[in-house]
Amino acid sequence: MAIESQKTSIRDVAELDELLSEPTEATIRALAALEGDLLILGVGGKMGPTLARMAKRASELAGIRRRVIGVSRFSSHECEHQLQVWGVETIRCDLLNRKSLFELPEAANVIYMAGMKFGSTGQEALTWAMNSFLPGLVCERYPHSRIAAFSTGNVYGLCPVSKKGSRESDPLNPMGEYAMSCLGRERIFEHFSRTGKMNITILRLNYASEMRYGVLLDVAKRVYAEQAVPLSMGYLNAIWQGDASAMSLQALGHASVPSCVINIAGPELLSVRSIAEEFGALFQKPVRFEGVESDDALLSDAGRAFELFGHPRVSAAQLMTWIAHWIARGGATSTKPTRFEERAGRF
Protein backbone atom coordinates (compact mmCIF):
# COMPACT_ATOMS: atom_id res chain seq x y z
CA MET A 1 0.00 0.00 0.00
CA ALA A 2 1.47 3.35 -1.03
CA ILE A 3 1.28 6.57 0.95
CA GLU A 4 0.61 9.56 -1.29
CA SER A 5 4.08 10.90 -2.02
CA GLN A 6 2.77 14.34 -3.01
CA LYS A 7 0.70 14.84 0.15
CA THR A 8 2.00 18.09 1.65
CA SER A 9 0.18 17.99 4.97
CA ILE A 10 -1.71 15.73 7.34
CA ARG A 11 -5.10 17.11 8.28
CA ASP A 12 -5.62 15.92 11.87
CA VAL A 13 -4.86 13.20 14.43
CA ALA A 14 -7.39 10.82 12.85
CA GLU A 15 -5.66 11.02 9.47
CA LEU A 16 -2.24 10.77 11.12
CA ASP A 17 -3.18 7.60 13.02
CA GLU A 18 -4.67 6.17 9.82
CA LEU A 19 -1.42 6.74 7.92
CA LEU A 20 0.78 5.52 10.77
CA SER A 21 -1.13 2.23 10.93
CA GLU A 22 -1.36 1.61 7.18
CA PRO A 23 0.31 -1.77 6.55
CA THR A 24 2.58 -2.45 3.61
CA GLU A 25 1.87 -5.36 1.29
CA ALA A 26 4.96 -7.05 2.73
CA THR A 27 3.58 -6.68 6.26
CA ILE A 28 0.28 -8.21 5.20
CA ARG A 29 2.12 -11.17 3.66
CA ALA A 30 4.32 -11.55 6.74
CA LEU A 31 1.38 -11.70 9.15
CA ALA A 32 -0.51 -14.02 6.81
CA ALA A 33 2.40 -16.47 7.12
CA LEU A 34 2.31 -16.48 10.93
CA GLU A 35 -0.04 -18.67 12.94
CA GLY A 36 -1.54 -17.67 16.26
CA ASP A 37 -2.44 -14.58 18.22
CA LEU A 38 -0.25 -11.51 18.74
CA LEU A 39 0.48 -10.04 22.17
CA ILE A 40 2.09 -6.58 22.45
CA LEU A 41 3.75 -5.93 25.81
CA GLY A 42 4.13 -2.23 26.65
CA VAL A 43 1.62 -1.13 24.02
CA GLY A 44 0.89 2.20 25.72
CA GLY A 45 4.05 4.00 24.55
CA LYS A 46 4.54 6.41 21.65
CA MET A 47 4.73 3.71 18.99
CA GLY A 48 2.63 0.91 20.47
CA PRO A 49 -0.95 1.98 19.65
CA THR A 50 -0.51 2.47 15.91
CA LEU A 51 1.73 -0.61 15.64
CA ALA A 52 -1.06 -2.62 17.27
CA ARG A 53 -3.62 -1.13 14.89
CA MET A 54 -1.36 -1.94 11.92
CA ALA A 55 -1.13 -5.54 13.10
CA LYS A 56 -4.91 -5.73 13.33
CA ARG A 57 -5.42 -4.15 9.90
CA ALA A 58 -2.77 -6.34 8.25
CA SER A 59 -4.26 -9.51 9.76
CA GLU A 60 -7.74 -8.59 8.57
CA LEU A 61 -6.50 -7.75 5.07
CA ALA A 62 -4.70 -11.10 5.01
CA GLY A 63 -7.94 -12.85 5.93
CA ILE A 64 -6.46 -14.12 9.21
CA ARG A 65 -8.64 -14.39 12.30
CA ARG A 66 -6.24 -13.35 15.02
CA ARG A 67 -6.48 -11.75 18.43
CA VAL A 68 -4.26 -8.70 18.72
CA ILE A 69 -3.86 -7.96 22.43
CA GLY A 70 -2.22 -4.85 23.87
CA VAL A 71 -0.86 -4.98 27.43
CA SER A 72 0.04 -1.92 29.49
CA ARG A 73 -0.62 -0.25 32.82
CA PHE A 74 -2.61 2.25 30.71
CA SER A 75 -2.05 5.46 32.64
CA SER A 76 -4.00 7.01 29.75
CA HIS A 77 -7.62 5.82 29.59
CA GLU A 78 -7.87 7.54 26.20
CA CYS A 79 -5.17 5.27 24.77
CA GLU A 80 -6.89 2.15 26.08
CA HIS A 81 -10.26 3.24 24.68
CA GLN A 82 -8.79 4.10 21.28
CA LEU A 83 -7.17 0.69 20.97
CA GLN A 84 -10.48 -0.97 21.74
CA VAL A 85 -12.21 1.15 19.08
CA TRP A 86 -9.60 -0.09 16.60
CA GLY A 87 -10.39 -3.70 17.48
CA VAL A 88 -7.34 -4.32 19.67
CA GLU A 89 -8.07 -6.14 22.93
CA THR A 90 -6.54 -4.50 25.99
CA ILE A 91 -5.33 -5.87 29.32
CA ARG A 92 -4.12 -3.76 32.23
CA CYS A 93 -1.04 -5.27 33.80
CA ASP A 94 2.03 -4.32 35.83
CA LEU A 95 4.50 -6.51 33.98
CA LEU A 96 6.91 -6.58 36.93
CA ASN A 97 4.20 -8.30 38.96
CA ARG A 98 5.01 -11.94 38.29
CA LYS A 99 1.49 -13.17 39.15
CA SER A 100 -0.14 -10.66 36.77
CA LEU A 101 2.36 -11.43 34.02
CA PHE A 102 1.79 -15.17 34.24
CA GLU A 103 -1.99 -14.67 34.09
CA LEU A 104 -1.73 -13.07 30.64
CA PRO A 105 -3.19 -15.17 27.78
CA GLU A 106 -1.12 -17.47 25.62
CA ALA A 107 0.13 -16.03 22.33
CA ALA A 108 2.24 -17.58 19.61
CA ASN A 109 3.68 -14.16 18.72
CA VAL A 110 4.94 -11.49 21.12
CA ILE A 111 6.12 -7.95 20.45
CA TYR A 112 8.16 -6.72 23.41
CA MET A 113 8.01 -2.90 23.72
CA ALA A 114 8.25 -2.48 27.49
CA GLY A 115 11.12 -0.49 28.92
CA MET A 116 12.26 2.65 30.70
CA LYS A 117 14.31 5.51 29.26
CA PHE A 118 13.26 8.97 30.39
CA GLY A 119 13.62 9.37 34.13
CA SER A 120 16.20 6.59 34.25
CA THR A 121 18.76 8.95 35.82
CA GLY A 122 17.89 8.93 39.51
CA GLN A 123 15.86 5.71 39.15
CA GLU A 124 18.64 3.41 38.06
CA ALA A 125 17.36 0.38 39.99
CA LEU A 126 13.92 0.55 38.38
CA THR A 127 15.56 1.11 34.99
CA TRP A 128 17.54 -2.12 35.31
CA ALA A 129 14.49 -4.00 36.59
CA MET A 130 12.39 -2.87 33.62
CA ASN A 131 15.07 -3.17 30.95
CA SER A 132 17.04 -6.24 32.08
CA PHE A 133 15.09 -8.24 34.68
CA LEU A 134 11.66 -8.11 33.01
CA PRO A 135 12.87 -9.72 29.75
CA GLY A 136 13.82 -12.83 31.73
CA LEU A 137 10.34 -13.00 33.26
CA VAL A 138 8.78 -12.63 29.81
CA CYS A 139 10.92 -15.45 28.43
CA GLU A 140 9.86 -17.65 31.34
CA ARG A 141 6.20 -16.83 30.66
CA TYR A 142 6.37 -17.27 26.87
CA PRO A 143 9.06 -19.92 26.28
CA HIS A 144 7.37 -21.28 23.15
CA SER A 145 6.43 -17.95 21.53
CA ARG A 146 8.10 -16.13 18.68
CA ILE A 147 9.35 -12.77 20.03
CA ALA A 148 10.39 -9.48 18.41
CA ALA A 149 12.00 -7.40 21.15
CA PHE A 150 12.65 -3.68 20.85
CA SER A 151 16.08 -2.39 21.81
CA THR A 152 17.90 0.79 20.85
CA GLY A 153 20.80 2.01 18.75
CA ASN A 154 22.19 3.53 21.96
CA VAL A 155 23.87 0.20 22.72
CA TYR A 156 26.44 0.95 20.00
CA GLY A 157 27.67 4.16 21.53
CA LEU A 158 29.00 6.99 19.38
CA CYS A 159 29.95 6.18 15.80
CA PRO A 160 32.33 8.22 13.59
CA VAL A 161 30.21 10.28 11.20
CA SER A 162 32.50 9.22 8.36
CA LYS A 163 31.37 5.62 8.86
CA LYS A 164 27.68 6.68 8.43
CA GLY A 165 26.30 4.27 10.99
CA SER A 166 26.90 1.25 13.21
CA ARG A 167 26.15 -2.18 11.80
CA GLU A 168 24.69 -5.16 13.65
CA SER A 169 28.09 -6.89 13.75
CA ASP A 170 29.93 -3.90 15.27
CA PRO A 171 31.24 -4.07 18.84
CA LEU A 172 28.96 -2.48 21.44
CA ASN A 173 29.95 0.42 23.68
CA PRO A 174 26.89 1.64 25.61
CA MET A 175 27.19 4.93 27.49
CA GLY A 176 25.21 5.51 30.67
CA GLU A 177 22.98 3.22 32.66
CA TYR A 178 20.04 3.42 30.25
CA ALA A 179 22.09 2.08 27.33
CA MET A 180 23.86 -0.47 29.55
CA SER A 181 20.53 -1.77 30.85
CA CYS A 182 19.27 -2.06 27.26
CA LEU A 183 22.31 -4.17 26.43
CA GLY A 184 21.35 -6.20 29.49
CA ARG A 185 17.91 -6.67 27.92
CA GLU A 186 19.50 -7.98 24.73
CA ARG A 187 21.78 -10.38 26.58
CA ILE A 188 18.90 -11.83 28.59
CA PHE A 189 16.86 -12.45 25.43
CA GLU A 190 19.94 -13.95 23.78
CA HIS A 191 20.51 -16.23 26.77
CA PHE A 192 16.98 -17.61 26.72
CA SER A 193 17.10 -17.99 22.96
CA ARG A 194 20.23 -20.10 23.22
CA THR A 195 19.27 -22.16 26.26
CA GLY A 196 15.53 -22.47 25.59
CA LYS A 197 15.68 -22.63 21.78
CA MET A 198 13.42 -19.56 21.59
CA ASN A 199 12.95 -17.78 18.26
CA ILE A 200 13.79 -14.13 18.93
CA THR A 201 14.59 -11.01 16.89
CA ILE A 202 16.13 -7.98 18.60
CA LEU A 203 15.27 -4.63 16.98
CA ARG A 204 17.69 -1.75 17.48
CA LEU A 205 15.53 1.28 16.68
CA ASN A 206 17.02 4.69 15.96
CA TYR A 207 14.76 6.92 15.76
CA ALA A 208 11.02 6.60 14.98
CA SER A 209 9.40 9.96 14.22
CA GLU A 210 5.96 11.34 13.45
CA MET A 211 4.11 14.66 13.80
CA ARG A 212 3.62 14.51 17.58
CA TYR A 213 6.97 13.15 18.70
CA GLY A 214 10.51 12.53 17.51
CA VAL A 215 13.90 14.07 16.84
CA LEU A 216 12.75 15.97 13.75
CA LEU A 217 9.87 17.47 15.70
CA ASP A 218 12.27 18.56 18.46
CA VAL A 219 14.39 20.50 15.96
CA ALA A 220 11.31 21.96 14.25
CA LYS A 221 9.81 23.19 17.53
CA ARG A 222 13.04 24.95 18.46
CA VAL A 223 13.22 26.67 15.09
CA TYR A 224 9.55 27.68 15.19
CA ALA A 225 10.02 29.16 18.69
CA GLU A 226 13.22 30.87 17.50
CA GLN A 227 15.26 29.01 20.10
CA ALA A 228 18.85 27.93 19.55
CA VAL A 229 19.29 24.43 18.10
CA PRO A 230 22.02 22.39 19.84
CA LEU A 231 24.68 20.91 17.56
CA SER A 232 26.44 18.68 20.10
CA MET A 233 24.85 15.65 18.43
CA GLY A 234 25.24 17.02 14.94
CA TYR A 235 23.96 14.06 12.92
CA LEU A 236 21.13 11.56 13.29
CA ASN A 237 18.85 9.00 11.66
CA ALA A 238 15.07 9.28 11.58
CA ILE A 239 12.43 6.94 10.19
CA TRP A 240 8.70 7.47 9.71
CA GLN A 241 7.05 5.60 12.57
CA GLY A 242 4.71 3.82 10.17
CA ASP A 243 7.69 2.35 8.33
CA ALA A 244 9.35 1.35 11.61
CA SER A 245 6.17 -0.45 12.68
CA ALA A 246 5.85 -2.25 9.35
CA MET A 247 9.44 -3.50 9.58
CA SER A 248 9.03 -4.52 13.23
CA LEU A 249 5.98 -6.66 12.49
CA GLN A 250 7.74 -8.31 9.56
CA ALA A 251 10.69 -9.03 11.84
CA LEU A 252 8.58 -11.58 13.73
CA GLY A 253 8.98 -13.87 10.72
CA HIS A 254 12.77 -13.63 10.98
CA ALA A 255 13.02 -14.60 14.65
CA SER A 256 15.68 -17.26 15.06
CA VAL A 257 17.76 -19.45 17.36
CA PRO A 258 20.05 -17.99 18.48
CA SER A 259 18.44 -14.56 18.45
CA CYS A 260 19.26 -12.23 15.58
CA VAL A 261 19.67 -8.44 15.56
CA ILE A 262 18.22 -6.00 13.02
CA ASN A 263 18.78 -2.25 12.95
CA ILE A 264 15.70 -0.18 12.14
CA ALA A 265 16.56 3.37 11.08
CA GLY A 266 16.15 5.80 8.23
CA PRO A 267 18.47 5.54 5.21
CA GLU A 268 19.60 9.16 5.30
CA LEU A 269 22.52 10.56 7.31
CA LEU A 270 20.80 13.73 8.49
CA SER A 271 22.69 16.87 9.51
CA VAL A 272 21.00 18.68 12.41
CA ARG A 273 22.26 21.97 10.98
CA SER A 274 20.73 21.24 7.57
CA ILE A 275 17.46 20.04 9.14
CA ALA A 276 17.18 23.26 11.14
CA GLU A 277 17.94 25.42 8.11
CA GLU A 278 15.27 23.58 6.10
CA PHE A 279 12.71 24.15 8.84
CA GLY A 280 13.79 27.78 8.96
CA ALA A 281 13.00 28.09 5.26
CA LEU A 282 9.66 26.30 5.66
CA PHE A 283 8.66 28.52 8.59
CA GLN A 284 10.34 31.63 7.15
CA LYS A 285 12.08 32.12 10.47
CA PRO A 286 15.71 32.81 11.41
CA VAL A 287 17.74 29.89 12.75
CA ARG A 288 20.18 30.05 15.66
CA PHE A 289 22.61 27.36 16.78
CA GLU A 290 24.54 26.58 19.94
CA GLY A 291 27.72 24.53 20.09
CA VAL A 292 29.48 22.80 17.22
CA GLU A 293 29.16 19.40 15.58
CA SER A 294 31.31 16.55 16.91
CA ASP A 295 32.86 14.05 14.54
CA ASP A 296 30.80 11.22 16.02
CA ALA A 297 27.13 10.60 16.81
CA LEU A 298 24.55 7.91 17.56
CA LEU A 299 24.04 6.52 14.05
CA SER A 300 22.79 3.20 12.70
CA ASP A 301 23.21 1.51 9.33
CA ALA A 302 19.89 -0.18 8.52
CA GLY A 303 21.02 -1.78 5.27
CA ARG A 304 20.10 -5.26 6.46
CA ALA A 305 16.55 -4.16 7.28
CA PHE A 306 16.17 -2.66 3.81
CA GLU A 307 17.34 -5.91 2.24
CA LEU A 308 14.78 -7.87 4.27
CA PHE A 309 11.83 -5.48 4.32
CA GLY A 310 12.39 -2.91 1.55
CA HIS A 311 13.08 0.81 1.86
CA PRO A 312 10.87 3.19 3.86
CA ARG A 313 7.85 4.62 2.07
CA VAL A 314 8.30 8.09 3.58
CA SER A 315 11.53 10.05 3.14
CA ALA A 316 12.98 12.43 5.72
CA ALA A 317 12.19 15.35 3.40
CA GLN A 318 8.52 14.31 3.19
CA LEU A 319 8.37 13.87 6.95
CA MET A 320 9.86 17.31 7.54
CA THR A 321 7.28 18.92 5.25
CA TRP A 322 4.46 17.23 7.16
CA ILE A 323 5.94 18.29 10.52
CA ALA A 324 6.32 21.91 9.42
CA HIS A 325 2.67 22.12 8.30
CA TRP A 326 1.55 20.37 11.49
CA ILE A 327 3.35 22.82 13.76
CA ALA A 328 2.29 25.88 11.78
CA ARG A 329 -1.35 24.79 12.13
CA GLY A 330 -1.00 24.27 15.87
CA GLY A 331 -1.26 20.48 15.76
CA ALA A 332 -0.97 18.62 19.08
CA THR A 333 2.57 17.57 20.04
CA SER A 334 4.21 15.83 22.97
CA THR A 335 5.60 18.02 25.73
CA LYS A 336 8.41 15.49 26.31
CA PRO A 337 11.53 16.09 24.19
CA THR A 338 13.59 13.16 22.91
CA ARG A 339 16.81 14.68 24.28
CA PHE A 340 18.56 13.47 21.14
CA GLU A 341 21.44 15.86 21.87
CA GLU A 342 22.44 13.91 25.01
CA ARG A 343 25.96 12.51 24.47
CA ALA A 344 26.67 11.00 27.90
CA GLY A 345 23.64 8.71 28.03
CA ARG A 346 21.89 10.46 30.93
CA PHE A 347 18.12 10.35 30.41
Language-model segments: which ranges?
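Conserved Rossmann-fold NAD(P)-dependent oxidoreductase catalytic core, especially the SDR/UDP-sugar
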Residues: D37, N109-Y112, K117, F133-E177
